[in-house]
Structures are given as structure tokens and as C-alpha cells.
């Protein structure tokens, strides 16, 4: 377990996660198949050739999932009780096959849980950045995090 406990998070804390991933055509096609997303914007090369993008765009929720996956090892792995909310998803620039995505995370709020004395709420802002240092996605995630165990 390498995640942090509730007490170890503070507002303004930031993480530049060391992992990156080059998104492949197979990633996008499999994600679309698994989620039954048949939008031509993600799957139809000929259709997209006639658009301003000129090529298929990777599904935005795949990118969000990738960002959260890249963030958990040094933030919430093994210490998350539950993810409670995802909000404010934005996709200011497209992700294309072959783009390499890395993630930066900032803690935007930390608060006590009113119903769970053994846990607290942490809100994260995740930012996905491509190989050209261009922001491709942002989202907020609220997680219910374990408190540190009391010494025996």
C-alpha cells in the first residue's frame, strides 16, 4: 500500500505523477467496445477525415480513467474507502492515437466526514497533459479516505 491517509493530505498539495502512457488505437477501440460507445468521432476514420480534427479522437472518459489510474499509486492506493463523486470534467484539447498522457493532481479540499469518524473527504483536481505539455483534460474527484490507524 502506497496511498496516503486522510491526515496526510492538505489543501494545495500537488503531485506530478511519474507515470505516463502512450494511448493506442487499440486502447480507444476497446474502450468504445466495452462501453458500447459507437460515436463516429471515436471510431470512423473516414468520417473524421472530413472534420477540423482530421482524425479520430480518443474517448474523453477513457482519458479521465487513465488520469485517475495514473494518480492512485502515490495518493490513494489502498487507503480509499470509496470514490464519492466526479465533477467538472473538461476536455480543452483532444487526445489522438499516439499521444502520451501524464497526470498532475492537486488537493483542493480536505474535510471531516460527518458520518464516518474513521474517514475523511478529500477532493482532488486531476489534470491530463500530453507530450507537448498541452492540457487535454481536467476533472475533480471526491474520495472518502481512511484515517491513520490508531497505535495499539
Task: Cite the ranges covered by each PLM segment.
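HotDog/MaoC-like acyl-thioester-processing domains
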Residues: 1-11, 91, 95-100, 104-152
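Hot-dog-fold acyl-thioester-processing enzymes
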Residues: 1-85, 150-152
Amino acid at each position: 500500500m502506497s496511498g496516503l491517509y486522510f491526515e496526510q493530505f492538505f489543501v494545495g498539495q500537488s503531485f506530478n505523477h511519474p507515470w505516463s502512457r502512450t494511448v493506442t488505437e487499440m486502447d480507444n477501440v476497446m474502450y468504445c467496445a466495452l462501453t458500447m460507445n459507437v460515436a463516429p468521432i471515436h471510431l470512423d476514420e473516414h468520417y473524421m477525415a472530413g472534420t477540423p480534427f482530421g482524425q479520430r479522437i480518443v474517448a474523453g472518459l477513457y482519458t479521465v480513467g487513465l488520469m485517475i489510474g495514473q494518480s492512485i499509486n502515490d495518493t490513494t492506493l489502498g487507503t480509499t474507502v470509496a470514490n464519492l463523486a466526479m465533477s467538472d470534467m473538461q476536455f480543452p484539447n483532444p487526445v489522438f492515437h499516439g499521444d502520451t498522457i501524464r497526470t498532475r493532481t492537486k488537493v483542493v479540499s480536505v474535510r471531516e466526514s460527518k458520518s464516518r469518524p474513521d474517514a475523511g473527504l478529500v477532493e482532488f483536481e486531476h489534470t491530463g497533459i500530453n507530450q507537448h505539455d498541452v492540457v487535454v483534460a481536467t476533472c475533480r474527484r471526491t474520495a472518502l479516505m481512511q484515517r491513520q490507524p490508531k497505535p495499539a
